[in-house]
Regions:
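Long, contiguous bundles of hydrophobic transmembrane helices that form the permeation core
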Residues: 2-53, 330-486, 591-682, 710-719
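Conserved, well-structured core domains of diverse proteins
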Residues: 2-142, 148, 152
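Membrane-water interface regions at transmembrane-helix termini and the short interhelical loops
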Residues: 62-66, 86-97, 152-168, 319-326, ...
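Interfacial loop-to-helix junctions that mark the boundaries of transmembrane helices
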Residues: 65-74, 96-102, 136-145, 202-210, ...
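Core transmembrane alpha-helical segments of multi-pass membrane transporters/permeases
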Residues: 112, 156, 160, 164-165, ...
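Membrane-interfacial loop-to-helix junctions in multi-pass transporters
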Residues: 144-149, 201-214, 240-254, 285-291, ...
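Transmembrane alpha-helix interface/packing and boundary motifs in multi-pass membrane proteins
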Residues: 163, 222-226, 257-266, 298-304, ...
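Hydrophobic transmembrane alpha-helices that form the pore/transport pathway of multi-pass ion
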Residues: 235-303, 309-316, 322, 546-580, ...
Length: 719
């Protein structure tokens, strides 16, 4: 571990620059990183407030029973309050401990507009659509309906928060939808504001509901998982596993990004975090800078489709499709495997073409050092286990978070102290394994989980007090709560804005209009509808966060594919989910690729095109499961042989396409062979026995011809 940390530090220092340079890259390509500068006492206060926000989210979801119509605006009000504290009016503000008066006013007013709803819930609900007659203030002869005023102000302040944290693209999209409500559907101001602000189909709809529960808790879990040091462990394991192979550092980037992507749902964040280590290593091995940046960007973007934590959009998918999240995880396994396999094969063929070697084994981490650290993945194992046996996502996330706390404290100790700090795991493991056996109606049945949690927490506190562990442990826990709370802000704002779009679609019946338009435009052909949906997803994704992109597509295009074209509902939503993600590496606005290019010091557009070429699987796989649902374990044909045949043909197809794109199979090839391999690969990924055999024949012919050419070269060399 120490050897690899040394290697990592050298890579960052020599190629990327200082950690300040890495932060600068994050701020350039990731709006969430552009925060105010707080120092000293104000920084400590803000740190505690944000940590308390994270703690409140856990307590609210686990132990406080609250009406959904009260919980959602309360959550969004707190998010708005913190957004104005963290994010300045314009990018790059460097004033220390400074928050202008207008930000203070907007923070207070915005929070109040949303807090007013839960504080007066019964009266507002009873008023129904007659909100203009409730809470009326009379000024002379003018009657001012406060609820409409609060709705307008609250919505506008939400838009300003979105501009600061997320960006303008989603605001422009929302503005078009709102204009349609007024000008296209002929709705009046009262109707629009009532539906957008006071119902559970608009701003306070399903997206913000899922965000305030599952997404928020999993974001906090992700922050704690990072605090355990599991990301470094993943990178070390990837180095030990494939670092020695041909073009090792690129393969390390693929494997480590796939693993680290389970922890973080940000394409740009993953690219910068793991890329600061892997990109310099790839360049040092001999990969061109634009290719090195592209490998990391494509791999990090794929982290959002990697089970078990697939980014915020996956939780929304579970809610919108009405499928348990456990099934979402299972159905995403094969597509994710094929995606990363495609990238892995691409970097392999590129390494062979360039004649690149791996890293010396003596420079790589040793398994005898890594295996004792296997406990670091315990929270992930527990999370998956609890979800699979039927715990709610919220419960699984909270208990897995507590495992993270224990694991983080263990990881910072040495020798026997590790065993002492592991004692709280005993009641936690007991609860995890036995809670489903607690008999309903008994004390343990009603309170067993809470009791085990309380015992574990008490042991944790006692351990900390008696053992006097590493002084960094407690600050690390506070930092994790702070990071978790802060990471909830951008997702919350994006979900709120996407709720405006979803609200307009519901209120105006726009969804049915779009279904009719696309069905007519495609003339009933599914492939045309799929291509149009893909283009919409990619265009929207150019600047719109994955979560918001998915919500927009799930409320507009997914119903078109499902209702209008007869596509399976799960396949339709997964199709939109995939193409919303690949927008991060698709030119011209490919933020993850641009972040990778900044670290690699390569041309941004060349890096983006290389990333698109490497991630070609992401543009093919959705079409495979759209036409053959067995790939995502949906339908009546889900049998072992049918799934196995799809995986085998898709794997061979990915290999053929990757080989053709990189220009190497077992030797350099001419353009005609490259085109033939890409065409043959596409035939193999198209469902059907005839196309599979035709594609396989092309691959075999090219392989045989290359072997013949190799023999000719050897014969000529021996003469």
């Amino acid at each position: 571990m120490a050897e690899n940390e040394k290697l990592n530090n050298v890579a960052v220092d020599n190629d990327v620059g200082t950690m300040e340079d890495v932060d600068a890259i994050m701020k350039k390509y990731d709006r969430e990183s552009n925060t105010r500068v707080w120092e000293g006492t104000p920084r400590k206060i803000l740190r505690v407030l944000t940590a308390l926000f994270g703690i409140f989210l856990i307590v609210m979801n686990m132990w406080i029973k609250m009406d959904e119509r009260a919980r959602r605006p309360l959550f969004l009000g707190l998010v708005i309050l913190l957004v104005f504290i963290y994010y300045p009016i314009k990018k790059g503000s460097q004033k220390v401990n400074y928050m202008p008066w207008y930000d203070i006013v907007m923070a207070a007013v915005g929070a109040f507009c949303f807090f007013f709803y839960p504080l007066n819930l019964e009266k507002i609900v009873s008023a129904g659509t007659r909100i203009q007659k409730a809470f009326v203030v009379q000024i002379g002869s003018i009657s001012i309906p406060l609820l409409i005023v609060f709705a307008i102000i609250g919505t506008l302040i939400l838009v300003e928060c979105c501009r600061r944290v997320v960006g303008m693209p989603i605001i422009c999209v929302a503005a078009v939808f709102v204009l349609y409500a007024f000008l296209g559907a002929g709705k009046d101001l009262k109707t629009v504001m009532y539906n957008l602000f006071y119902t559970t189909t608009g701003i306070l709809g399903t997206p913000i509901g899922v965000c305030s529960t599952y997404i928020a808790l999993f974001v906090i879990f992700g922050a704690f998982l990072e605090a355990t040091g599991v990301a470094n462990f993943f990178i070390d394991c990837a180095n030990a596993l494939v670092g020695w192979a041909s073009g090792g550092p690129a393969k390390v980037a693929v494997v480590s990004s796939a693993l680290c992507g389970m922890v973080s749902g940000s394409s740009v964040g993953n690219t910068v975090t793991t890329g600061s280590v892997t990109i310099p290593m790839m360049k040092k091995t001999g990969y061109p800078p634009e290719f090195a940046g592209a490998v990391e960007a494509a791999s990090s973007t794929g982290g959002q489709i990697m089970p078990p934590i697939m980014g915020a959009a996956a939780f929304l998918m579970a809610e919108m499709v009405g499928v348990p999240y456990a099934k979402i995880i299972v159905r995403a396994i094969l597509p994710a495997f094929l995606y990363f396999l495609g990238i892995f094969l691409g970097v392999h063929f590129k390494a062979k073409k360039l004649g690149l070697k791996g890293l010396p084994r003596e420079e790589l981490p040793k398994w005898k050092i890594l295996l004792p650290q296997i406990y670091l993945i315990l929270p992930l194992v527990v999370l998956v286990y609890m979800i699979m046996i039927g715990f709610t996502m919220a419960t699984a996330a909270v208990y897995a978070t507590l495992y993270c706390v224990v694991v983080a404290m263990i990881s910072r100790e040495e020798g026997k102290k590790k065993l002492v700090m592991a004692i709280p795991l005993i009641p936690l493991l007991f609860m995890t394994l036995m809670s489903r056996s607690f008999e309903p109606g008994t004390f343990m049945g009603e309170n067993g989980s809470t009791l085990c949690l309380a015992i574990a927490f008490a042991l944790l506190v006692i351990n900390y007090a008696i053992s006097k562990p590493n002084v960094k442990s407690l600050p690390t826990i506070i930092d994790a709560f702070e990071n978790g709370g802060k990471n909830c802000l951008s997702v919350g704002i994006a979900c709120g804005m996407a709720g405006i779009i979803a609200g307009v679609v519901t209120m105006t019946g726009l969804g049915q209009v779009l279904i009719g338009a696309i069905v007519g435009l495609s003339n009933g052909h599914l492939i045309i509808a799929l291509v149009l949906t893909m283009l919409c997803c990619i265009v929207l994704g150019m600047g719109v966060p994955t979560t918001a992109n998915y919500i927009i597509m799930a409320t507009t295009c997914a119903p078109i594919l499902a209702s209008g074209m007869g596509l399976n509902l799960m396949a339709a939503h997964m199709f939109c989910f995939y193409f919303g993600i690949v927008a991060d590496i698709t030119p011209p606005v490919a933020l993850a690729a641009y972040a990778g290019s900044a670290i690699a010091k390569a041309p941004p557009m060349k890096t983006a095109w290389n990333a698109t070429r490497l991630a070609i699987a992401a543009f093919i796989i959705p079409y495979i499961f759209a036409y053959n649902n067995a790939l995502i374990f949906v339908g009546n044909d889900v049998k072992f042989l049918s799934v196995a045949s799809i995986v085998i043909s898709a794997t061979l197809g990915m290999a053929s396409i990757a080989s053709g794109l990189m220009g190497y199979l077992i030797r350099d090839m001419k353009w005609i062979s490259r085109i033939a391999l890409v065409a043959g690969g596409l035939l193999m990924v198209i469902p059907g026995t005839v196309t599979d055999l035709a594609g396989l024949a092309v691959l075999v012919v090219v392989l045989v011809l290359q072997r013949i050419e190799n023999k000719k070269d050897k014969a000529a060399a021996s003469v």
